[in-house]
Amino acid sequence: MSLRAGTPLPRRIRSTPEAASAPVRKRSATFKSEAVRAGVLSLLFLLLLLGIWHVATLQKEQAAGANDEYAKLMGKGSVKTTGFPTPAQMGATALKQLSDPFYDKGPNDKGVGIQLGFSLARVGLGFALAALIAIPLGFVIGMSPLIYRALDPFIQVLKPISPLAWMPLALYTIKDSSISGIFVIFICSVWPMLINTAFGVANVRREWLNVAKTLEVNAVRKAFLVILPAAAPTIMTGMRISMGIAWLVIVAAEMLVGGTGIGYFVWNEWNNLSLTNVIFAVLTIGVVGMLLDLVFGRLQKLVTYVD
């Protein structure tokens, strides 16, 4: 096929940086728009919950007023009832607690910041001890089918036991409530990390191990350069689960042993009949738990690779 004179030649389409980055910008804009819509929807849900809460507490106050009038008619005097706290009362309590979270007026009167510090310290120590034992042991179990079969019955027996069931034995043996709380955190944190580490190590791709064997990589280098990066996402999942369980357990443990911690703060405020402080502490526990999960979620993304 011949081209006639004067026929323009087809131009070669060149990929410019602007053209290559266009899909990326489009995906980024889509993600931002979805994030904005999700944020607006979350705000609407929050306003709806606050509205329901406000209406419910108003009905409670009206019912209490009717009971007061009935009591006066019956000659029993005025009945003083506080009812469930309103959102306005909770806002005032939150402002008061957050304005001075680190006050210390005695053994039974400490700020929520100090109590959170005690709880986070116990969780951190128990979690770190569990990681130091569970991850190396999980490596050994995952790399040796024989050791897996030998230890699996013990793991299956000990794993379902509630961590709080160990508290009486810990208090009797250790005779220190704070260390007993750390021990309970260790017990509840060790199993998810141990099982996930063993699973991740045992399921490393055979072709990667075969390449390391072909290159005559020694066992230590293979463990750190091949197995650990491949199993890291699964290990981090176990650590994330362990942290969530540890934060759940420490609240109940501190209610049992008393002394310090956010769990003790909740129980102490309940004994003082301060329902607003109880609700504030419960919400604080939820926010801290969410932040801990976000941290481990970020770490999990850092070690996760795409095939």
Where does each model-flagged region fall?
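Loop-to-helix entry region at the N-terminal start of transmembrane alpha-helices
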Residues: 114, 118-122, 172-194, 231, ...
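Transmembrane alpha-helical segments of polytopic membrane transport and secretion proteins
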Residues: 1-47, 294-307
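C-terminal transmembrane helix and the adjacent membrane-cytosol boundary/short C-terminal tail
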Residues: 202, 280-307
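Transmembrane alpha-helices
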Residues: 183, 187, 220-253, 280, ...
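Short cytoplasmic-facing helical segments at TM-TM junctions of multi-pass membrane proteins
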Residues: 192-241, 262, 266
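Periplasmic/extracellular loop-to-transmembrane helix junction in inner-membrane transport proteins
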Residues: 27-28, 60-128
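Transmembrane-helix boundary motif in ABC transporter permease subunits
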Residues: 125-155
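Generic hydrophobic transmembrane alpha-helix motif, especially the helices
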Residues: 142, 152-192, 198-200
